[in-house]
């Protein structure tokens, strides 16, 4: 039975204040985080350098298909409900209802996880600090950034993402110099000595096909957040033009960042290194990024990466609060949630949905 489109009409109370640069950085910021900075070492350790690289490329290709499909729908029907609205309109209202509430719940819980992660990160500098106070502080920051306006959220996310992108570019640049022997830390045998790590032990495909499938979940987690473009399309300027452009740019940037970063790590650190298997936010010294920077002689590499990871956690929580708030607002507009959550203040912020999510 066809869905009643009147219930899925595009909300008009939100303001279209997100520019093209905001869209690109929102998606990049949602995808480059602890999955790359910390968990990437585990993928190399479990599947070998070749297996990890192949896993990121395969999942990246899947994300490309997802992004182009979502981008096409978002450009045609730019609403904050994104795929939940599309599901209700083109499949079934029950499908859209389930999709929307599951997505809201997913991000609402993820915000709590990010707050716990922030506690662990801050424990690096303040081991005796009160974790509850740190969580309350960061929750207040996330709430404030989302309560100002959508433009305020976009600007904050833009600079959060810029820090992470700069770190990845710097890491790749330093890593290439180490591989070429220009900067210390590479193989003493020279350039080809680094490539010998790909034939060490069971490399390049340690663990075979089962290991490749096993790390796919870690890789999939790393790409989580690219769908935020669909959510943000409902508040973007000229979505018919900016959304397709952002989708094309974001996919290639994210894929290249991940592929080159994994390649650099695998050419400088043996996949048998026990540090790679660790995946602990409470000990940033085991991050493959930290290990490479320390080998290059960068002083206080652990402290720098800890700050970057903190930025990643705040960025993820900030994006999650935005996405879940807009989803709850759209559900209310479609009469799939209490109508009180459809209230929008004069700055274009769905405050009741924001309070409920917080």
Residue ranges, per PLM feature:
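Helix-loop-helix connectors at the membrane interface of multi-pass transporters/channels
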Residues: 1-10, 84-94, 115-135, 167-170, ...
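Membrane-interface "cap" regions at the ends of multi-pass membrane proteins
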Residues: 1-41, 45-50, 64-68, 80, ...
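Hydrophobic alpha-helical transmembrane segments
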Residues: 24, 52-57, 97, 132-137, ...
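Hydrophobic transmembrane alpha-helices that form the core helical bundles
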Residues: 42, 54-55, 63-147, 152, ...
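Inter-helical loop and helix-membrane interface segments of multi-pass membrane transporters/permeases
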Residues: 46, 115-143, 182-212, 279-283
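Transmembrane helix-loop junctions in multipass membrane proteins, especially transporters and channels
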Residues: 68-76, 128, 150-154, 176-187, ...
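TM-loop-TM module centered on a large, flexible mid-protein loop between adjacent transmembrane helices
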Residues: 85, 92, 124, 197-202, ...
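Membrane-interface loop-to-helix entry segments
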Residues: 132-193, 223-224, 247-255
